[in-house]
Amino acid sequence: PSSSHTVGPMKAARLFLKNAVEEQHFDAASTVMVELFGSLALTGVGHGTDKAILMGLEGETPEEVDPESVDLRFHQICRDEKINLLGNRMVSFSTANNLIFHKDEQLPHHSNGMRFSLMGHPQKTLFSQIFYSVGGGFVLEEKEMENSSCENSIRVRYPFSSASELLQHCENQSMSIADLVLTNEKTWHHEDKIQEGINSIWYVMKGC
């Protein structure tokens, strides 16, 4: 699995519903729509993005989900056409109609974009948000992407675009690859959040 295609989407799905609860839209929901764009749409099924998102919608986190139960639960959702949002609200959900892969479209800020929409009756959009899975299991809401300078415009301490440049930095600084990459990651995230993301990735990969 890929952290950008599994851990991130699972977190985004759960966060979306948590936000819907805070905005008091959750209790009126009759279903939820999920749209995937760019790389998530093109390669998501192979990486298990669809399964990760459905688990996130049911309230699971990468740290606590039982990997051995995922396939069974996924097939139950597909068969019954129902999903238990956050584990306490059963709504209709068809993977054919409610999980859309926009393979020819990409959202503006990142190739791993997702749009979640909570729907009421009759097909009224109650609450909608866009999220981006930006790598390492981290997710950002659209407003966070818009309000920040974004990764590409922030210069890391040790920039590199090839393996040879990476190794040259390591030699010059007497650093391991892991330490150098960690230093760069601190440009965007606190170390505790980085370690949390790494642990999440390892847990999911170990269970597969």
Range-by-range predicted roles:
Residues P1-A13:
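Conserved phosphate/anionic-ligand binding catalytic regions in large, soluble enzymes, centered on
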Residues K18-C208:
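Feature of Fe-S/electron-transfer and energy-metabolism proteins
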